[in-house]
UniProtKB/Swiss-Prot annotation:
Name this polypeptide is given: Glycerol-3-phosphate acyltransferase
Function description: Catalyzes the transfer of an acyl group from acyl-phosphate (acyl-PO(4)) to glycerol-3-phosphate (G3P) to form lysophosphatidic acid (LPA). This enzyme utilizes acyl-phosphate as fatty acyl donor, but not acyl-CoA or acyl-ACP.
Pfam families for the chain: G3P_acyltransf
Transmembrane segments: 2-22, 51-71, 84-104, 114-134, 159-179
Family designation: Belongs to the PlsY family.
UniProt GO cellular component terms: plasma membrane
Single GO biological process annotation from the record: phospholipid biosynthetic process
Topology of this chain in the membrane: Multi-pass membrane protein
The organism's place on the tree of life at top rank: Bacteria
Pathway: Lipid metabolism; phospholipid metabolism
Gene this chain is encoded by: plsY
Length: 200
């Protein structure tokens, strides 16, 4: 009965674009108007405002975490199924990528996906975070780190997540993140992708 409202609330939480909100708070340009045009922490970092980038990263991860944790806490009182929790997780990411509050022009979903995974399975999130860190420090390319961690997510989920529906949600999340990184994949293949902190 409460499945659809829960998914809708999760989508609305996901639709809060912290890159835009934080940038506006600091009097910065809209991140959709410079760099890669992506409203995410990496692009905000291109403005030179490290604090704003950090707050964007934390905010985007937190909204994914909060949306799913809220559903999990209320799962029994509201009678939400495990599949409903999976749908809530996916809705938070969809909200980030296509936010109703910002003209459906959102980010690529890496931080929000991490927050979602943390709420579903801390072990899965930890594996992905460690892979991202190793790749980011090793190659200094944010998109490469994100893509590697994204590909690893469903594999880790299959080991650590207690419900099959959550594993399939992780597969869907990974596919969405990969889809949103299609331009980055092309740049990586062509050797044109920018380094972390670069201007492109």
């Amino acid at each position: 009965m409460f499945n659809i409202p829960a998914v809708a609330v999760s989508y609305l939480i996901g639709s809060l674009s912290f890159a835009v909100i934080v940038s506006k708070y600091y009097g910065m340009d809209d991140p959709r108007t410079y760099g890669s045009g992506n409203p995410g922490a990496t692009n905000v970092l291109r403005s030179g405002k490290k604090k704003a980038a950090a707050l964007t990263l934390l905010g985007d991860a937190a909204k994914g975490l909060v949306a799913v944790l809220l559903a999990r806490v209320l799962q029994e009182p509201l009678g939400l199924s495990d599949s409903a929790i999976a749908a809530v997780a996916l809705a938070a990411l969809v909200g980030h990528m296509w936010p109703v509050f910002f003209g459906f022009k959102g980010g690529k979903g890496v931080a929000t996906a991490l927050g979602v995974l943390l709420a579903l399975s801390p072990a899965t999130a930890l594996v992905c975070a460690l892979i991202w860190l190793v790749m980011a420090f090793g190659f200094k390319v944010s998109s490469l780190a994100a893509l590697t961690a994204t590909i690893a997510a469903p594999v880790a989920a299959s080991f650590f997540m207690p419900h099959v529906s959550w594993v399939w949600a992780t597969v869907a999340i990974a596919l969405l993140v990969l889809f949103r990184h299609k331009s980055n994949i092309v740049k990586l293949l062509e050797g044109r992708e920018s380094k972390i902190g670069g201007s492109r």
